[in-house]
Curated annotation (Swiss-Prot):
Catalytic activity annotation: O-phospho-L-tyrosyl-[protein] + H2O = L-tyrosyl-[protein] + phosphate
Compositional bias of kind Basic and acidic residues: 821-843
Subcellular location, record wording: Cell projection, Axon
Protein name, as recorded: Tensin homolog
Chief localization: other
Gene that produces this protein: tns-1
Tissue: Expressed in ventral motor neurons, including ventral and dorsal D-type neurons, and in a subset of cells in the head.
Length: 1354
């Protein structure tokens, strides 16, 4: 009690402190217990997996708005990360804009405490089923705010739908859905929910049929209720249609209708207890919901009257109330014909307009935030409806105190700008319903929003307008204020023209309210304001006046910065004994490259409508000019994989100073960049100058100022589009090419000549100091020591080149391999070592963009040779930028590289060699390995920095030898691969003359062919490093989930997670056995569960195993292994105890078995598996590498695929087709056969003989008589189910066209169900047996077990 008192006191003080001026109230003990109970419950959006493909998101109605939005965003992000784009959300609660935007939810909601309509329930189940059938990974998410009852209804209905219609329903899934629904629809579930689920199940199974005739309600009788005053309200499709007078209940009370009330569809009854006094409120006694289309009526008299009797357990709210008499009943006297007079529903609504409106559900279709805005408007402008309310009260004979309590939105102080901001939706709120033609509007007391004023004096032609017009007499602040200029939209120019804004959540509107309240914002603050990316528009029309003011303010600040630029942006040169000064610009560059930098977490807007940061913002902003280019953010991604090499590569060079415009430069020869600069200054007369840090020549600084003032002043006179283009042009100029005269004039030519002379002298001094640099001299000495080793390896490589098998390097048109080529280029680079000028310029150009490998000609040697026209000093750039390919320690690459993990291979067995199609040309395998190696180096270049030439030359040696060794090791890859290698020339697989019949019994399968079940994989297709290399056919592409789990470089898309990052050489096993074939696709099943793994291995021999992704430990793997003996203390059973489970945990160094200290760390998952296939180590037994999928046998696979390839056909009798909507399964076949048989008996249809063929493409029907149709084809994706007649009826074949002697006279019936093209509904096609040797069961088994099984497997 002390804790409760303390909690109560703290709540009081919080109430007083947070809402000063309001009365502090006292919390009762009941309220305190309720609040404590709610506090103990989990708040926010909760995620619950009903099945592996059905998720429920729910949130209680008591959750605060802030907590709801935060948890909603978090839950949606988790689901999207787990399932990518394979999710779709159905919202069964009230529509909200934040749910639609964050989850992209489909609105299918209905009010709480009511059952959904049958139409809505059928639509949801059909959509769920269709979505799950589209892809095996598709996940359905059901969202509900306000409890789980509505989710439970949908789950239960979908469970019934699967039980009747679906073919691949799992017993576990059905049990999970049943258990979930019973938690909310069990003994305490509302009777109306159960009633509608029974309607739904009966309609699917065909036990009841839909009756679309209306019902006429004559009177309602209530018996055994306690004596109270009540009145009834009747809703049709949740719209109020009738309200009775107040009646005092007794033992038997009757509500007489003044005629008959016409009802059809979903009907909702409410019995409301009238208010006992004028100040008291009403309460609902009971409710009941039913559907007239599903009622089975039995007349009780000659007039056709029927009685629908509902007992206590069938009435909501009182079914479990012990205070109510158990004999309570409600009787509805109805008929299919109207009585003497029919009640006019419209008249009833007009007489009782107030009560039905306040108690209706018509506002449910509005979004919840829209409904809140509507309630605010009702509070703010209640004086508009004051007189109309009085008129309604006088016209209503029933006391207004009898109405129910309606939730009223929180009172909001009147503010004219609020309705204007949200006025775009007011036309949908039904505001006009409050102000009718006969309503009297009081005298106007102030400026009303345009959306409300247009309801008063709006023309007829504007009634259908979707968005409100902007009223001309609104004050300026009502339309927009100055602070709102920098937020994404501008009001329309014409006063009569509507404007449109993107939808935003309630939080966005709240932000805009706060921002609209800002006044007197200066232009400098506007210019420096960063616009959030979510507020920007992709297209903005002609800029308004405030746009120009922002541009002027920015340009003036730009000029001020230029006046100070020469002193702040001078280049620093170093000579012998000098230290290179660290510039602030390098910090900015590192911030761009770092993945966790601020610039990446908060990227600048890509559109011109975003904020432009001026030069006044920071000291180095002008140097980061490339960040102002919108394309930079469209292309930059720190985690993007390296791009494949283009046809031709352009190396851009440019200075890092804002004074020197840049231009693209193509290197066409192996020259020193200093020579290029000197030559360009003589030939072009560029007006560019660089100041000396030590000399500080004033004349050169003046030239800088004059040049830059002109360049930017010329730009300032351009349009905003040219201003953005200027940023790009400034990044694309260099001192080595002719100056773009768009940025210069003849008046600067004399100053440019002076700059040429000064620049030439400075560059010569730099080059002379570079020649005597001690670091360069020492590096040259070290590299010359390796020359002899290179010469010794040349002879061995040449000998290996001559010993290559036929059809390799020479056959592919490759040049002789020269390992010295790389060194010659490196030596040439050392003789032309670039100056700091060139290094600084190169660093300024890269900016952390994704690297691009060097191009290769089609006839290039497989060694890492640079293409013709590419300078050797390109290698020098690798040393100065971490985004360029760098040599690396080859411990990770040696014998452990997966070529197919980087490229997609196209295999054509008719070609003499395996080729890779990339960029429109064919590369041999040698060049393919070369490209793959280059791409791998780019992937790992960020973690490998080399500064010594010795390591660089050693890397060149390795690349030459590795490429040569890889080509030699792939000597079997160019063998001729033709179908004749596996099939005889006259094989039926290649050349079929006829389609075989359906197999009646299990016969001997066709001979085993690897191409039939293993996708063309064969034994000697090359070496496989670490079990993952192998031939090119042994791999799937990166997009295949079940491909090899071999990981390279710490990243893989083959599974949900990676098993290795960086590996330490001292603790990793590197020497792995070489395997001929990659078998990981058989033993690596990332998506299966623990139970599925047990079922897969239960009947397999010891040593059989499977690896899956662990669900309990994210990032880890689970190893399921079949052993020969159970663990100690476990009794033998059904075989599941023989399946042992081990956890493979990842670590920074690799993967290892958890809990096994004597186990080493393996660099990859494949390495662990293959090592344990040689020795058991800590496992109970050695792993046995599978030769086929453990889920199936090779014989089964080969027979299945061979039969599908050949197809099977026979002649049957086509009886007819029936549209069955979404029904499928045996129940569908039963009903369709009955319908078709009745049609044939009545002569409405004609049975004909057809040719029935089943193949991998689907089912094809050909009419043998050409009387009904010619040919019909049903795609394999459209076929859902096939089955025999459950009650085994017989069909008289003698009436069919094409019947002859020898055919079956009394034949059994069968059918298959297929989707109707371009529709979500199904059709059932019925057939009868015709040939004695081809029973219908053989056709059905072939469709289900061969065609549909293969479709599900693929």
């Amino acid at each position: 009690m002390a804790a409760a008192a303390l909690c109560c006191a703290s709540r009081k003080s919080n109430k007083y402190n947070n809402e000063a001026g309001y009365e502090v109230y006292t919390i009762s003990e009941d309220q305190l217990r309720l609040k404590q109970k709610m506090k103990d419950r989990k708040e926010g959006v909760q995620v619950e997996y009903i099945t592996s493909r059905l998720i429920v998101l729910s949130c209680t109605s008591e959750t605060s708005e802030r907590k709801f939005v935060e948890s909603l965003l978090k839950a949606s992000q988790q689901i999207q990360n787990a399932h990518n784009k394979h999710i779709r959300v159905w919202n069964v609660s009230q529509r909200r804009h934040d749910i639609s935007s964050s989850l992209d939810a489909i609105p299918f909601g209905w009010p709480s405490e009511t059952a959904p309509s049958l139409e809505k329930l059928c639509t949801i189940c059909k959509n769920l089923d269709q979505w799950m059938l589209e892809h095996p990974l598709n996940i359905a998410v059901i969202f509900c705010k306000g409890g789980l009852e509505r989710c439970a209804i949908v789950v239960n209905a979908f469970m019934r739908f699967n039980a009747i219609s679906a073919t691949d329903d799992s017993v576990d899934d059905r049990f999970s859905m049943q258990r979930f629904s019973e938690r909310f629809l069990g003994p305490d579930g509302p009777p109306s929910y159960k009633r509608y689920l029974g309607y739904f199940s009966s309609l699917l199974s065909g036990r009841i049929s839909v009756n679309s005739d209306p019902l006429y309600l004559h009177n309602i009788i209530l018996t055994f209720f306690e004596p109270i005053n009540v009145f009834l309200k009747i809703y049709e499709r949740l719209v109020p249609v009738y309200q009775s007078k107040t009646v005092a209940l007794n033992k038997s009370s009757k509500f007489e209708m003044d005629g008959s009330l016409k009802l059809r569809g979903d009907i909702f009854f409410k019995c409301i207890v009238a208010a006992s006094s004028p100040g008291s409120s009403t309460r609902c006694l009971f409710t009941c919901q039913l559907n007239t289309c599903a009622l089975e009526l039995h007349p009780i008299n000659s007039e056709g009257y029927s009685v629908v009797r509902l007992h206590k357990e069938e009435l909501d709210l009182i079914f479990n109330d012990k205070k109510i008499d158990n004999r309570v009943t409600v009787e509805l006297v109805v008929s299919h014909t109207s009585g003497p007079t029919t009640i006019a529903t419209a008249a009833v609504q007009s007489v009782h307009s107030l009560l039905p409106r306040n108690n209706s559900y018509e506002t449910f279709e509005l979004a919840q935030d829209d409904e809140t805005n509507r309630s605010r408007l009702e509070v703010e402008y209640s004086e508009i409806r004051k007189k109309s309310t009085k008129s309604s009260k006088s016209a209503n004979p029933i006391n207004n105190n009898q109405e129910e309590e309606m939730p009223v939105g929180p009172p909001v102080p009147p503010k004219p700008s609020t309705p204007i901001m949200n006025g775009e939706r007011l036309g949908e709120y039904g505001v006009g319903g409050h102000i009718g033609n006969g309503d009297v509007v009081p005298e106007r007391r102030g400026i009303l929003p345009a959306s409300l004023r247009e309801k008063i004096n709006q023309k007829k032609e504007l009634e259908g307008r979707a968005t409100p017009s902007i009223e001309p007499d609104l004050v300026g602040r009502d339309r927009y204020d100055k602070a709102s200029r920098c937020f994404s939209y501008v009001p329309a120019k014409s006063m009569q023209e509507a404007f449109e804004r993107p939808r935003r959540t309630s939080f966005s509107r709240a932000i805009e309210k706060r921002e609209n309240s800002v006044e007197n914002v200066s232009q400098e603050e506007v210019a420096r304001t960063e616009i959030p990316q979510s507020y920007q528009q992709n297209d903005i029309s002609t800029p308004a006046k405030w746009d120009e003011q922002v541009e002027d303010a920015k340009q003036s600040a730009l000029l001020e910065e230029l006046a100070r630029a020469p002193s702040a942006m001078q280049h620093n040169y170093w000579g012998n004994g000098e230290v290179d000064n660290v510039q602030v610009v390098d910090q900015a560059q590192r911030a761009v490259i770092t993945p966790t930098s601020t610039l990446q977490r908060r990227p600048k807007p890509p559109a011109r409508s975003g904020s432009y940061r001026t030069l006044n913002d920071d000291a180095y902003c002008s140097d980061m000019d490339e960040l102002c280019d919108p394309e930079y953010y469209l292309n930059y991604n720190s985690n993007t994989a390296p791009l494949p090499p283009p046809r031709r590569q352009e190396q851009h060079a440019g200075t890092r100073s804002v004074q020197l415009p840049r231009k693209k430069m193509n290197f066409d020869a192996v020259t020193d960049p200093l020579d290029d600069v000197l030559e360009s200054t003589k030939r072009l007369g560029s007006a560019y100058s660089v100041g000396d840090v030590r000399g500080g020549q004033q004349q050169q600084q003046e030239q800088h100022n004059a040049s830059n003032d002109f360049n930017f002043s010329n730009t300032l006179n351009n349009t905003p589009t040219d201003y953005r283009q200027h940023y790009r042009n400034r990044n694309c100029q260099s001192v080595t090419t002719p100056r773009n005269h768009h940025f210069s004039t003849p008046s600067r030519e004399q100053e440019a000549d002076a700059a040429d002379t000064w620049l030439s002298g400075k560059l010569k001094k730099v080059r002379s100091k570079r020649d005597i640099d001690p670091d360069i001299v020492r590096r040259r000495t070290q590299e010359k020591m390796l020359l002899e080793e290179l010469k010794d390896s040349a002879a061995n490589n040449d000998e290996n080149q001559h010993n290559l098998p036929n059809g390799h390097a020479r056959g592919a048109g490759l040049q002789n391999i020269d390992p010295l080529a790389e060194f010659r280029r490196e030596e040439e680079r050392l003789r032309n070592t670039r100056s700091p000028y060139g290094e600084e310029r190169w660093r300024g150009r890269m900016r952390g963009k994704p690297p691009t490998p060097p191009p290769r000609e089609s006839s290039a040697s497989p060694v890492n040779s640079l293409p013709r026209g590419t300078p050797a000093h390109h290698m020098d750039r690798q040393r100065h930028n971490q985004s360029v390919p760098l040599p690396m320690h080859h411990r990770q690459f040696d014998e452990d590289f997966d070529v197919n993990s980087l490229f997609n291979f196209s295999h054509d067995p008719r070609q003499q060699s395996t080729t890779l199609e990339r960029g429109g040309r064919s590369l041999s395998r040698g060049a393919r390995i070369q490209d793959a190696y280059y791409a791998s180096q780019q992937d790992l270049s960020a973690n490998n920095r080399f500064n010594s030439g010795q390591e660089r030359v050693a890397a060149a040696i390795y690349r030459a030898e590795t490429a040569h060794r890889d080509m030699y090791a792939s000597g079997t890859i160019n063998r001729a691969e033709t179908p004749g290698r596996y099939f005889p020339e006259n094989s039926a697989v290649l050349e079929r003359s006829s389609t075989p019949s359906f197999p009646v019994s299990r016969a001997t399968p066709l001979p085993f062919h690897p191409l039939l079940y293993n996708n063309g994989e064969r034994g000697g297709s090359g070496h496989a490093a670490g079990g993952g290399g192998g031939g090119h056919n042994g791999y799937s592409t990166m997009n295949n989930r079940s491909a090899s789990p071999r990981l390279f470089g710490g990243s893989s898309t083959l599974s949900r997670r990676s098993s290795v990052n960086s590996v330490d050489t001292s603790e990793i096993i590197h020497h792995h056995p070489l395997f001929v074939k990659d078998t990981s696709k058989y033993w690596y099943k990332p998506t299966i569960s623990r139970e599925q793994a047990i079922n897969m291995l239960r009947d397999k021999p010891p040593g059989t195993f499977v690896v899956r992704d662990s669900n309990s430990f994210p990032g880890a793997f689970g190893l399921a292994l079949k052993v020969s003996t159970p663990p100690p203390g476990v009794n033998p059973g059904d075989g599941s105890e023989l399946v042992r489970h081990f956890l493979i945990e990842p670590s920074p160094k690799g993967v290892k078995l958890k809990g096994c200290n004597n186990e080493p760390v393996f660099g990859s998952l494949s390495a662990l598996v293959y090592q344990h296939s040689i020795t058991a180590l800590a496992l109970p037994t050695k792993l046995v590498l599978p030769d086929f999928d453990p889920a199936a046998t090779p014989e089964h696979l080969s027979a299945t695929q061979a039969l599908l390839e050949q197809g099977a056909a026979c002649n049957v009798v086509y009886v007819g087709s029936v549209d069955v909507e979404s029904l499928t399964g045996n129940e569908c076949v039963k009903r369709s056969i009955a319908t078709c048989s009745q049609r044939a008996i009545n002569g409405d249809s004609r049975a004909v003989s057809v040719h029935f063929k089943v193949s991998s493409q689907g089912v094809t029907l050909t009419d043998n008589t050409r009387k009904v149709f010619f040919r019909r084809h049903f795609n394999v994706q459209s076929v859902i189910f096939a089955g025999m007649d459950p009650i085994e009826r017989r069909f008289e074949n003698t009436r069919a066209l094409g019947f002859h002697d020898g055919c079956i006279a009394q034949a059994r019936l069968f059918a298959f169900v297929a989707r109707i093209p371009s529709s979500s509904e199904n059709a059932c096609h019925v057939f009868a047996e015709l040939e004695p040797e081809q029973p219908g069961s053989a056709v059905v088994n072939f469709i289900n077990k061969v065609m549909l099984a293969q479709k599900n497997r693929s």
